[in-house]
């Protein structure tokens, strides 16, 4: 019995140390995504992403992107947490779009289309957004979301893995260089895909990289690279994790051209 108590105590201590290491933001995400959501899906007989789309279709105004964003934010605040960029960080994204007025934007990670709607609604006539999404179900929901918002002509959805699609952009999708890249996919892909964009000649002097979730869940290797390279000028925007009072942030990295990876 004492041995069992000691073992339990050590297990609890290890769990607490793990939680401290991960941070409560990641723990909260884990709880929502891997505990509550599967139970909810089982009870409802559908997926969270389908429920978000249905809520938008029932509560937003067709052809009105702002009402689509507000409906998604309402659902994710009041009903189920979801990994959209959210309104707090979304306002930072809006400011960046307005400042640089990009003609060609690449988004890595579409999810349900929230950020695609958010960016596309601010693009100038003739500008376009390419969004890459590996999950075919998410890609289908993003297309329906864009159709409902009336933005389908501004956005092209590319279904597949970013590392496979990026090398195809020049020949298959008529891309010379990109004006802006929004990174919001797998966090361990931020750095490899940034390097791949450089290697493929898709970045020009002045290309804006805007990366979400650089604090939670965090992208330490990406931040170390862009902040430590004279190829980028970086600005950090502190904010909150979507729909939570957990500190997160966006990183803006403006490409300066190829150079030494170490700043002098």
From Swiss-Prot:
Class of the enzyme per the UniProt entry, highest EC level: transferase
Mod. after translation: The N-terminus is blocked.
Positions that bind S-adenosyl-L-methionine: 85, 107, 115, 133-134, 160-163, 184
Catalytic activities: a catechol + S-adenosyl-L-methionine = a guaiacol + S-adenosyl-L-homocysteine + H(+); 2-hydroxyestrone + S-adenosyl-L-methionine = 2-hydroxy-3-methoxy-estrone + S-adenosyl-L-homocysteine + H(+); 4-hydroxyestrone + S-adenosyl-L-methionine = 4-methoxyestrone + S-adenosyl-L-homocysteine + H(+); 2-hydroxyestrone + S-adenosyl-L-methionine = 2-methoxyestrone + S-adenosyl-L-homocysteine + H(+)
One CC-aspect GO term: dendrite
UniProt KW Transmembrane helix keyword: yes
Keyword tags: Catecholamine metabolism, Cell membrane, Cytoplasm, Lipid metabolism, Magnesium, Membrane, Metal-binding, Methyltransferase, Neurotransmitter degradation, Phosphoprotein, S-adenosyl-L-methionine, Signal-anchor, Transferase, Transmembrane, Transmembrane helix
Cofactor binding comment, as recorded: Binds 1 Mg(2+) ion per subunit.
EC number: 2.1.1.6
Binding site for substrate: 187, 213, 242
GO biological process: artery development; behavioral fear response; catecholamine catabolic process; catecholamine metabolic process; cellular response to cocaine; cellular response to phosphate starvation; cerebellar cortex morphogenesis; cholesterol efflux
Residue ranges of the TM segments: 3-19
Record: residues binding Mg(2+): 184, 212-213
Cytoplasmic compartment segments: 1-2
Modification type Phosphoserine: residues: 259-260, 264
GO-annotated molecular function: catechol O-methyltransferase activity; magnesium ion binding
Top-level taxon: Eukaryota
Extracellular topological domain: 20-264
Known cofactor(s): Mg(2+)
Record function comment: Catalyzes the O-methylation, and thereby the inactivation, of catecholamine neurotransmitters and catechol hormones. Also shortens the biological half-lives of certain neuroactive drugs, like L-DOPA, alpha-methyl DOPA and isoproterenol.
Family: Belongs to the class I-like SAM-binding methyltransferase superfamily. Cation-dependent O-methyltransferase family.
Name listed for the protein in its UniProt record: Catechol O-methyltransferase
Gene label: Comt
């Amino acid at each position: 019995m004492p041995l069992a108590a000691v073992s339990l105590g050590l297990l609890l201590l290890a769990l607490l140390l793990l939680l401290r290491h991960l941070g409560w933001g990641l723990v909260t995400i884990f709880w929502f995504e891997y505990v509550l959501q599967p139970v909810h899906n089982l009870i409802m007989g559908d997926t969270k992403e389908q429920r978000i789309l249905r809520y938008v279709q029932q509560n937003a105004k067709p052809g009105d992107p702002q009402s689509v964003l507000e409906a998604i934010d309402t659902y994710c605040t009041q009903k189920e947490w979801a990994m959209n960029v959210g309104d707090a960080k979304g306002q930072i994204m809006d400011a960046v779009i307005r400042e640089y007025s990009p003609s060609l934007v690449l988004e890595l990670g579409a999810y349900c289309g929230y950020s695609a709607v958010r960016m596309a609604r601010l693009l100038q006539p003739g500008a376009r957004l390419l969004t890459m999404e590996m999950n075919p179900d998410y890609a289908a929901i993003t297309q329906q979301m864009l159709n409902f918002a009336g933005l389908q002509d501004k956005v092209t959805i590319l279904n597949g893995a970013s590392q496979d699609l990026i090398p195809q952009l020049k020949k298959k999708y008529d891309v010379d260089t990109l004006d802006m890249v929004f990174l919001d996919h797998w966090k361990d892909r931020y750095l490899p895909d940034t390097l791949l964009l450089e290697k493929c000649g898709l970045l020009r002097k002045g290309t804006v990289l805007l990366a979400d979730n650089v604090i939670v869940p965090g992208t330490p290797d990406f931040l170390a690279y862009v902040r430590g390279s004279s190829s980028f000028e970086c600005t950090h925007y502190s904010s909150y994790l979507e729909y939570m009072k957990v500190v997160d942030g966006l990183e803006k990295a403006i490409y300066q051209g190829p150079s030494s990876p170490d700043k002098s």
